[in-house]
Amino acid sequence: MPNMSLTKVPMPEQDPNVRNKNFEEVALGYTKEMAMEEATRCINCKNKPCMSGCPVCVRIPEFIAKVAAGEFEEAYKIITSTNGLPAVCGRVCPQENQCEGKCIRGIKGEPVSIGRLERFVADYHMAHSNDDTIKPESNGIKVAVVGAGPAGLTCAGDLAKLGYEVTIFEAFHKAGGVLVYGIPEFRLPKAIVQKEVENLEALGVKVETDMVIGRVLSIDEIMEMGFKAVFIGSGAGLPSFMGIEGEALVGVYSANEYLTRANLMKAYLDDYDTPIIKSKNVAVVGGGNVAMDAARTALRLGAENVYIVYRRGMEELPARGEEVHHAIEEGIIFKTLNNPVKLIGDEDGRVCKMECVEMELGEPDSSGRRRPMVIEGSNFQLDVDTVIMSLGTSPNPLIRTTTKGLEANKWGCLVVNEDTLETTRDNVYAGGDAVTGAATVILAMGAGKQAAASIHERLSK
């Protein structure tokens, strides 16, 4: 009989007053007993709506049934038949809007905790299994992947399993893309990402780091090296700013730069070459997951006061509810219905104040959210010594501007065939944030799978 409890088995977590001073993972993971208990909440319904919410088509009820039976390795095999990054997805996917958002159990009570179960299965496999990956027999066909983020890693893995000789060209010195430079250690430990990359390498995938495509090599030069197809999964790393006075002051960062310095380049250690200046009062402008990551990172780096400055209300925050909840628990101060209009510097050129205006919400705009409007005469100043702009990102134009015939839309996103993900260049495919603009890890992975299938169909003819 299914477990008809209306609530999920709680996830063990670090105490907020302890974790806000360290970079260790916040969520500690289920035990075997917890996972099996939660798995019994799945009623294995006939239509399986949860699967329609998964961009990589994980056979969710099947793997959960194996967890309930204690057959964790069988569950892992089911998950990894379609998802090459289960330990990542179990931690950072917005399940509440995807698989769990469609779970029948959520109609009355809480949905089954699909993400936590996926994480448990992946972590159990890492802890208890020997690496028994079998490298597929090569078909002799070379395929290049640009970018070692979620889209590129997924595309590479799917093609490698089919026997293709895949080389990933990664601009940074570590593979993982946003998984290593954008998402903090306390949400996604880098050892997890490294293990997933090693799993790909065991399949025969080669990873070339420090390869900025468009500078070191062009797409045309890659094709001349004998690669029969190229997948561009270069992400969206070009940050947006407000265009207000003072954004060039010392102490003003994009969230992208701030998190990259902290996550990838260990800027919190004094002996590294890319330090983040010490901060007392930090303001993060924006309300998405990246803003929460930046704010929570600033707190861990020693800031006394960290503010989220957002022009709409708490109900309109685009960040995951779990991330907002964790930020509040840790002491982040939310200044909603506020918007910066000017940054003010001291005599040394470092930001020292942020001038804001209060906002009120009017009628809904084209996105369906109520439009924020300035309350005249409501200006006030906030003492700050660091400002982090978390206003979204767009694709870097480097590849587009160095590749003839590669078309992009007005936002700089590559134009692709929706069915095949082929660009306007023959045998050049693209997916993930390079096509959609900044989106989720799992959507990028779905694009990587789609492109791999298209490349295989083309090259196997």
Predicted regions and their residues:
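Rossmann-like dinucleotide-binding cores of NAD(P)H-dependent redox enzymes
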Residues: 168, 172-203, 207, 295-342
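Residue-level detector of alpha-helix initiation sites
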Residues: 84, 149-151, 174, 288-290, ...
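Glycine/serine-rich phosphate-binding loop and adjoining beta1-alpha1 elements at the start
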Residues: 52, 56-135, 201, 209, ...
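N-terminal Rossmann-like FAD-binding beta1-loop-alpha1 element of flavoenzymes
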Residues: 141-167, 291-299
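Glycine-rich dinucleotide-binding loop and its adjacent helix/turn
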Residues: 121-137, 195-215, 241-301, 409-419, ...
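Feature captures the FAD/FMN-dependent oxidoreductase FAD-binding
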Residues: 74, 137, 142-146, 194-244, ...
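A conserved FAD-binding loop/helix module that cradles the flavin
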Residues: 294, 434-461
